[in-house]
UniProtKB/Swiss-Prot annotation:
Annotated gene: CML17
Location of the EF-hand domain: 4-39, 40-75, 88-123, 126-161
Residues noted as binding Ca(2+) 2 in the record, renumbered to the chain: 53, 55, 57, 59, 64
UniProt keyword Protein biosynthesis, yes or no: no
Protein name, UniProt field: Probable calcium-binding protein CML17
UniProt xrefs under PANTHER family: EF-HAND CALCIUM-BINDING DOMAIN CONTAINING PROTEIN
Binding site for Ca(2+) 3: 101, 103, 105, 112
Pfam family, one: EF-hand_7
Length: 164
């Protein structure tokens, strides 16, 4: 994994690791997902953590988080196989897009981006100017909004690259 990908992954991990102890607890994961508007059932969350938690401590550390990322990237990366992984990838991308597209109009606006970033406690999105710059970095057609295609391209190129 490239250094910039490792740094990006570390930033994402730290967003979920609210107390900064180097482990994402079930509570931290629940809280982060709820802030994104993605409530998860306890059983589903427990199963997810059990799949990720290689050392069995009930939490997700940076190594386990990295392993999960690498596994997802191998599945997403294409390379043959049936269409199943692509369908899951598309559905996951749509679900993530819908978190940001709060009014459901098919676009992520400056205000919507700001609201989601604020709910996550991300400082870089505190002003409309910051959010406008972030959107400008991925807005291919120049309409001042991010559509689903632009969102997918951004996610495949590095989901949090605009937060630097």
């Amino acid at each position: 994994m490239a250094c910039d990908q490792q740094a990006e992954l570390r930033r994402v991990f730290e967003l979920f690791d609210r107390d900064g102890d180097g482990r994402i607890t079930r509570e931290e994961l629940t809280e982060s997902l709820e802030r994104l508007g993605m409530p998860v059932h306890r059983e589903e969350l427990a199963a997810t953590i059990a799949r990720i938690d290689a050392n069995g401590d009930g939490c997700v550390d940076m190594d386990e988080f990295t392993q999960l990322y690498e596994t997802v990237m191998r599945v997403d990366g294409g390379g043959g196989g049936g269409g199943g992984a692509c369908d899951v990838d598309e559905a996951s991308m749509r679900e993530a897009f819908d978190v940001f597209d709060r009014n459901g109009d098919g676009f992520i606006t400056v205000d919507e981006l700001g609201a989601v970033l604020a709910s996550l406690g991300i400082k870089q999105g505190r002003t409309a100017e910051d959010c406008g710059r972030m959107i400008g970095q991925v807005d291919r057609d120049g309409d001042g909004r991010v559509d689903f295609l632009e969102f997918k391209q951004m996610m495949r190129g590095g989901a949090f690259a605009t937060l630097r």
